[in-house]
Amino acid sequence: MDVLHAHDLYGEQLIDRVGDAVNEDAGDDLDTLVEGQQQQRLGVYRQMDILLDAPQEPPLGVFPAQGGPNGPPRLRKKRSFYTMTKPTPPCQSQEPEMCVLMASVTRAMRHVREDQRGEYFANYLVENMTSQNYPNGVGLPQHWGQL
């Protein structure tokens, strides 16, 4: 009679882990790699799971606009573009501040055809921006961007 010994039954199987015996694994670590990847994915998504499980911030009962310990709900003021704008004084709504030379060239350009205005503008400045027309620089731009 053959007597079965425990070590004879499992002598042929090398068990790395419990999963190897259940899955009849050949002893390679393929399932270990797959499980490691699953653990890594769980670690990546752990923070997202924590955020999704978190309660709404702030809790609706504590927020004063919804009522609660601070008193009755307060109505929020609705803002509109028309209510936020302030009327400008009449002097600001007209033409912006400009030097005398720019004002005169603007007036002169109104009488020139649209396709010739660029050339006319340059010629007008060359002819009229002289020390004879503006003695001691009075009326000329005092800083960049004033033209």
Curated annotation (Swiss-Prot):
Output the superkingdom of the source species. Eukaryota
**Where does the record locate the signal sequence feature?**
none
Give the keywords, sorted: Developmental protein, Differentiation, Glycoprotein, Spermatogenesis
What GO biological process terms are annotated to this protein in UniProt? sperm individualization
InterPro entries of this UniProt entry? Soti
Q: Which residues are glycosylated?
A: N128
Pfam families attached to this UniProt entry: SOTI
- What biological function has been recorded for the protein in this entry? Post-meiotically transcribed gene that has a role in late spermiogenesis; required for actin cone progression during spermatid individualization.
- Put simply, this protein is called Male-specific protein scotti
Gene that this sequence comes from = soti
